Amino acid sequence: KGFIRHLAAFGKNVLYLRLDLVTERMKVLTGMLPDPYFSFDQLDKLSTLAGIRYFILLGDYNKIDINIHHKSKEFRQLLRSLSDRYPVGIHPSSKSSNNTLQLIKERKRLEEITKKPIYDSRQHFLLLTMPGTYHALLEAGITDDYTMGFADNIGFRAGTAFPFYWFDL
């Protein structure tokens, strides 16, 4: 996170008298404690047990897409490191679910950072629209999508957990 976001979170913790969180945040920022939200080392250990695939959100920051800025040096280094060890795909932003140009922009950002072609996507379940999202994905060069679950039910939209080529009847 950037300075402004840390400052805002710090102020919120002070305002609500969450002194335990103020103390923890100060220790994390000064390096006295590890960041409790940085879980990539733990995921590395689990990678031998299960295939790990990362989907990266690189849209512009807004109310729905609260992500780290794509120009952050540390974030870019992390993404390069992850893409050297694991398959990496795009997690399209809320603004791109039916907007091909925005989706292409985000995919190109990830390709520029990782220096690898991006063909995989995982859309947020609540933002998936049929057939609009899939038309945008195909037009943007995305061939493999991992979104076919439901937001409010168990199961898969197509009745299968196996990959298949999406088609529009």
Predicted feature locations:
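Active-site-adjacent pocket scaffolds in enzyme catalytic domains
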Residues: 1-31, 41-46, 109-169
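Metal-dependent polysaccharide deacetylase catalytic core of the NodB/CE4 family, i.e.
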Residues: 20, 24, 38-128
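Aromatic-acidic/polar surface patches that form glycan- and anion
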Residues: 32, 36
